[in-house]
Amino acid sequence: MKQEHLALYLISFSLLFLFGCANQNTETKGTPLPFYNSADFTPEWINEEDEQYSQIHTIANFSFQNQSGDVINNESLAGKIYVADFFFTICPSICPKMTSNLEKVQTEFANDESVMLVSHTVMPWVDSVGVLKAYADMHGIENSKWHLLTGNTEKIYQLARQSYFAEKEIGLDK
């Protein structure tokens, strides 16, 4: 029961994280995106020239297996913009909605190699590589565009809490 609640909390706090690409066209540069350096999600607009830029929040190193059995880690996504979420394949509530929305993102950016999707399971004891492969096939997930990741439970939860600011309890302690 406790792990189900934790899984739901993690899903509730699934986040979209964007990482800038090194090859930006300055002619089409739009409004810069903010950085989120703390769990309260206060947006900060930091220029590369600012001293704070060297201290921006980043996602910790990770290494998990995707639906094809390939190892996916930070290096696999280096220089990419990626949308990350947390889900589990037997989730009856919000996960199907999130997957449906990410399917639209996959379609929209199908030909853009700089954009990736990464979905971390919060129930790796259920979501094996084979289960993730079946889920990917059922949802038309392109293996080269969207990684469904499984691995060590503690490492996934630690990544969720420390890198993506997902909390054990709803809300933040202030």
Segments predicted by a language model, with ranges:
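Thiol/disulfide oxidoreductase modules built on the thioredoxin-like
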Residues: 153-174
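Short, acidic, Ser/Thr-enriched surface-loop or helix-capping motifs
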Residues: 66-67
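Envelope-exposed proteins and targeting segments
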Residues: 58-60, 82, 116-118, 144, ...
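Extracytoplasmic/periplasmic, Sec-exported soluble proteins
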Residues: 54-56, 75, 90, 94-97, ...
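Short active-site neighborhood of thiol/selenol oxidoreductases, capturing the structured segment around
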Residues: 73-102, 118
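Structural microenvironment flanking redox-active thiols in thiol-disulfide oxidoreductases
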Residues: 99-159
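N-terminal targeting signals for export/organelle localization
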Residues: 1-61
